[in-house]
């Protein structure tokens, strides 16, 4: 790699953000980029060594820990050769390991948690000035994350947080202890952010929360009363934003899924016919041990209602294999739910012991070989179901939002890729009724000609092509940004801004 490191203190310093984990982390990394851009840092060009490397971490699975510390160790020789280089670690694993991170990786300069992302520029400057590692973990949000600037990664699709934290107590999950109790944003703030993104050409937004259909239980603004119908109304309000073509959300909790949300999904044209709803297990006994607060028939009844209201809806899920005490009978019940639910795809995981969770102390932890064998059977079943469901799409005309980075073999197959409204990945031939160059962010229609377990194929060419402002922005190399609120952070080569007091979460 080419180095971009600089020797003068006044020179512009470059950064790179490496992200692990869920969509919330991806969006948090956009905020990290926004903060550093606002402070005068510059994103390092691809293929170069950055002056500052930030790891935004995940703590859900043990292999995430191992991967992170392995990657940090690879930077130790670079750090030794260039003392001016800085390494920062944030996110859930940093919130969990705290000072212990420095014991494992003493060459790290900054450790920050999930609640104080906004402190990163100040911590970097303090570590540089004092020549001493800085560890700052706080137990509650300093500012609602939406108060922070964000540099978006896509010209056409954007994440929008509607809440942070989680009130559930799933025994396998460490996230609530790291991200805190649920706090909901004001509806007006959310819609204002969506409108600002649409004004910059964004066509698709995904509403983010650990449990989106609990939205309304605890607004950050104490003046707003608790409202269990708030999420359904938020979906309908998104439907009234001119220029917003696609709305998605993730993830709902089956225990709190209400009929008014299904009605809002079906009656709001820009809400996509897609639902990602975690199952975790098809065994009622295991669901109880997980503290999931619903049972398999309740889960299946929600799917039935969604498909009754939206017959073409694609349902996706998460499933954990090998939870402590899971018997072959329990596993067979999971397979039966998979057969009945007909998921269009599933994120499947082998249970991983997470210290600090109730499940870590449960008896009857399963041998690795048993978990692996069950996992393989689940994958085989789900792939057969997915293939059958995808084959049903053959012959249909579908709308596709052209995307970038989705088709790993597009260069070999002379195809481009995008996402259908129901979230399915589509590989298509870039020929036919095309209005100029096809660009990520443009909208096309194609006929599905083939199917595989993980994608659809459209090899008969493009039926129609609509150029969009998102495509214009992508072509020009422009990405949307949301400025947030000035937080008075130190700047490197950027004008100082007047400090603005932030209402934050109202905490």
Curated annotation (Swiss-Prot):
Primary location: cytoplasm
Family stated for the protein in its record: Belongs to the methylthiotransferase family. MiaB subfamily.
Molecular function GO labels: 4 iron, 4 sulfur cluster binding; metal ion binding; N6-isopentenyladenosine methylthiotransferase activity
Alphabetical UniProt keywords: 4Fe-4S, Cytoplasm, Iron, Iron-sulfur, Metal-binding, S-adenosyl-L-methionine, Transferase, tRNA processing
Positions with biased composition (Basic and acidic residues): 459-478
Chain ranges of the Radical SAM core domain: 152-388
UniProt-annotated binding residues for [4Fe-4S] cluster 1: 22, 58, 92
PANTHER family in the cross-refs: CDK5 REGULATORY SUBUNIT-ASSOCIATED PROTEIN 1 (PTHR43020), MITOCHONDRIAL TRNA METHYLTHIOTRANSFERASE CDK5RAP1 (PTHR43020:SF2)
Catalysed reactions listed for this entry: N(6)-dimethylallyladenosine(37) in tRNA + (sulfur carrier)-SH + AH2 + 2 S-adenosyl-L-methionine = 2-methylsulfanyl-N(6)-dimethylallyladenosine(37) in tRNA + (sulfur carrier)-H + 5'-deoxyadenosine + L-methionine + A + S-adenosyl-L-homocysteine + 2 H(+)
Compartment list: Cytoplasm
Source species: Mycobacteroides abscessus (strain ATCC 19977 / DSM 44196 / CCUG 20993 / CIP 104536 / JCM 13569 / NCTC 13031 / TMC 1543 / L948)
Co-factor: note: Binds 2 [4Fe-4S] clusters. One cluster is coordinated with 3 cysteines and an exchangeable S-adenosyl-L-methionine.
Name of the protein this chain belongs to: tRNA-2-methylthio-N(6)-dimethylallyladenosine synthase
Domain MTTase N-terminal residue range list: 13-129
E.C. numbers: 2.8.4.3
Protein purpose: Catalyzes the methylthiolation of N6-(dimethylallyl)adenosine (i(6)A), leading to the formation of 2-methylthio-N6-(dimethylallyl)adenosine (ms(2)i(6)A) at position 37 in tRNAs that read codons beginning with uridine.
NCBIfam families from the UniProt entry: miaB-methiolase, MiaB/RimO family radical SAM methylthiotransferase
GO CC terms in record: cytosol
UniProt-annotated binding residues for [4Fe-4S] cluster 2: 166, 170, 173
UniProt cross-references to InterPro entries, sorted A to Z: Elp3/MiaA/NifB-like_rSAM, Methylthiotransferase, Methylthiotransferase_CS, Methylthiotransferase_N, Methylthiotransferase_N_sf, MiaB_methiolase, rSAM, rSAM_horseshoe
Enzyme class: transferase
Region (Disordered): 459-492
Domain TRAM: 391-462
Subunit text: Monomer.
Cofactor requirements of the protein: [4Fe-4S] cluster
